[in-house]
Amino acid sequence: MAHKKGTGSTRNGRDSNAKRLGVKRYGGEKVTAGSILIRQRGTSVLPGVNVGQGKDDTLFALVDGVVNFETIRRATRERKRVCVTPL
């Protein structure tokens, strides 16, 4: 008989680091060209006028200006779009 209890094993004990996704600049905020507006996985928010999209779907400003969000109606559902109005 064992005098000590065996340690056993578990399949838990792992977690990934947070990816800091979300909106970084809100509507009405002034931004400079290259500023990151939204970090996202997939295109939950679409790029509008003066907004570029990175290969990881990050949206960023192409010009200096003011951020504004708008809702656009598609055939199946409503989508959000972010634009930058030049100053």
Curated annotation (Swiss-Prot):
Transcription regulation recorded as keyword: no
Pfam family, one: Ribosomal_L27
Region annotation Disordered: where it falls in the sequence: 1-25
Keyword Ubl conjugation (UniProt): no
InterPro entries per UniProt: Ribosomal_bL27, Ribosomal_bL27_CS
Protein name from the UniProt record: Large ribosomal subunit protein bL27
Originating species: Synechococcus sp. (strain RCC307)
One GO location term (cellular component): cytosolic large ribosomal subunit
Family in the record: Belongs to the bacterial ribosomal protein bL27 family.
Molecular function per GO: structural constituent of ribosome
Listed GO biological process terms: translation
Annotated keywords: Ribonucleoprotein, Ribosomal protein
Classification via PANTHER family: LARGE RIBOSOMAL SUBUNIT PROTEIN BL27M, RIBOSOMAL PROTEIN L27
